[in-house]
Regions:
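Conserved glycine-rich cofactor-binding loop
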Residues: 12-14
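Substrate-binding pocket helix/loop in short-chain dehydrogenase/reductase
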Residues: 96-97, 104-109, 198
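Short C-terminal tail/terminal secondary-structure segment
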Residues: 144, 227-250
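Conserved NAD(P)H cofactor-binding loop of Rossmann-fold oxidoreductase domains
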Residues: 88-93, 236
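Catalytic loop of short-chain dehydrogenase/reductase
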Residues: 133-171, 183, 237
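Conserved glycine-rich Rossmann-like NAD(P)H-binding loop of the short-chain dehydrogenase/reductase
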Residues: 28-42
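C-terminal substrate-recognition "lid" of short-chain dehydrogenase/reductases
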Residues: 209-233, 238
Length: 250
């Protein structure tokens, strides 16, 4: 089966845009959420519609519940019902236990965990049949915890748990799975040199191809016997076992 009525958060750029391209085509309807990337969202909409999809743009700040409600209302008015939700939008800022503040904590939890939970709840009320999917884009770091990016890591660990528990709650009508990417696209804080150093430190010593993440989304949608699973696509980053004391290095 294929998803035909799709909502993607953070769908205008990076991994979200790649997933939108993968899932679009004739007889497909997509609601693409964006926050600040209006021009990129509009350009992507034109490209996807050129190849036969119907695309609706939904602007919103996922840290605000009223914006989430607006996105759902727009999606319901345009799509009538849903069969696929991709919770991709994410906030990724650095803090530590020693210096985090309420603003950082609440924003990470709101965008990375609360918003997917609310969207999951509303999605479950607007489906038909037994072949519906939710895909959560998480992070490989949930499998190998560190004290860095404290609020982000806690929020993504919560999204991992949401994936498992909602798979239990929403079966058999909705399958819920997750993808935990590794180094795929350089973030704004990284130099090319730092990003290369990051992916060369993985066991497979390679950058993750975003198309592999898109293929995994498509695989989960078409696999009717899989739910509650989280797949690491990370060049083995979550398997890294070497530490300075083991290697005898400073």
């Amino acid at each position: 089966m294929e998803a035909r009525k799709i909502i993607i958060t953070g769908g205008a750029t990076r991994i979200g845009a790649a997933i939108a391209k993968k899932l679009s085509g004739p007889n497909k309807e997509l609601v693409l959420h964006f926050n600040k990337s209006k021009s990129k969202a509009e350009n992507l909409k034109k490209k996807l519609e050129y190849y036969g999809a119907k695309v609706y743009l939904a602007k919103g700040d996922l840290s605000k519940e009223k914006d989430i409600i607006k996105i759902i209302k727009l999606a319901k008015s345009k799509l009538k019902y849903f069969d696929c939700l991709v919770n991709n939008a994410s906030l990724f800022e650095n803090d530590k236990l020693e210096n985090f503040n309420n603003k950082s904590w609440e924003k990470h939890i709101s965008i990375n965990l609360k918003a997917p939970a609310l969207l999951t709840k509303e999605f479950s009320k607007n489906i038909r049949g037994n072949d519906n999917n939710i895909i959560n884009i998480i992070d490989q770091r949930i499998f190998k915890l560190t004290p860095y990016f404290f609020s982000y890591t806690i929020s993504k660990s919560g999204l991992y748990t949401l994936t498992k528990t909602s798979a239990m709650s929403l079966s058999p009508k909705i399958r819920v799975n997750g993808i935990a990417p590794g180094p795929t696209i350089k973030n704004q804080r990284q130099t090319e040199k730092h990003f290369k150093k990051q992916y060369l430190a993985t066991p497979l010593k390679r950058q993750v191809d975003v198309n592999e993440i898109c293929n995994a989304v498509d695989f989960f949608i078409k696999s009717r016997s899989i739910t509650g699973q989280v797949l690491a696509i990370d060049s083995g980053q979550s398997l890294n076992w070497q530490t300075p004391d083991v290697l005898g290095k400073e």
